């Protein structure tokens, strides 16, 4: 779960949790927000609570930590990280919003790739992908995301798209092999 004001994020997140439970699994939520909340685990959990995402409301644990695992290096030599709790899970479902980025343009801006690289990469992931400046984000973001897909258990992504009124307009699951 991320830190940006996504419409209905608590309803969407709870629906994903319920779906996973219906399949017989034991879900947990990981704050996927890079360095937001001052890059502090408890502050990230508090940000989620502000969106109505609490353990009580979601019916599952929230495992908040800034600890990461190094997954490998991109083709451009960038280290790629992943939240340790997410990495140790049997599978990861990436929930996010797809929208244009406000500071760069490219084939992948704000969405699944950014959530995998920056959100689940925590502060280290954010620093790595931003280290060459915004001018190289359109190159680094998908390159780092490919390392995530190749070296972790991303089951699928379930992004939403909002309309011009910031209302949920579309939610569609994307199989991992169709992220790129």
Residue ranges and their predicted role:
Residues 6-8, 36-38, 70-71, 101-102, ...:
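Flexible loop/turn segments at secondary-structure boundaries
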Residues 11-20, 43-54, 108-118:
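A glycine- and small-aliphatic-rich helix-loop capping segment at beta-alpha/alpha-beta transitions
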Residues 1-45:
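N-terminal active-site beta-alpha-beta segment that forms phosphate/nucleotide-binding
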Residues 43-107:
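An acidic, phosphate/nucleotide-engaging active-site surface
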Residues 82-180:
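Conserved, well-structured core segments that form the ligand-binding/active-site neighborhood
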């Amino acid at each position: 779960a991320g830190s940006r004001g996504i419409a209905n994020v608590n309803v969407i997140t709870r629906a994903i949790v319920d779906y996973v439970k219906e399949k017989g699994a034991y879900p947990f939520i990981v704050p996927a927000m890079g360095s937001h909340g001052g890059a502090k685990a408890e502050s990230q959990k508090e940000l989620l609570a502000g969106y109505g995402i609490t353990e009580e409301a979601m019916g599952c644990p929230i495992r908040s930590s800034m600890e990461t695992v190094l997954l490998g290096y991109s083709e451009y030599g960038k280290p790629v990280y992943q939240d340790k709790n997410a990495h140790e899970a049997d599978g990861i479902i990436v929930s996010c919003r797809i929208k244009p980025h406000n500071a760069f343009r490219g084939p992948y801006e704000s969405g699944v790739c950014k959530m995998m690289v920056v959100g689940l990469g925590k502060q280290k992931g954010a620093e790595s992908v931003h280290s060459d400046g915004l001018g190289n984000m359109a190159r680094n973001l998908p390159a780092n995301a490919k390392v995530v897909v190749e070296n972790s258990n991303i089951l699928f992504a379930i992004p939403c798209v909002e309309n011009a009124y910031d209302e949920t307009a579309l939610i569609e699951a994307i199989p991992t092999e169709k992220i790129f």
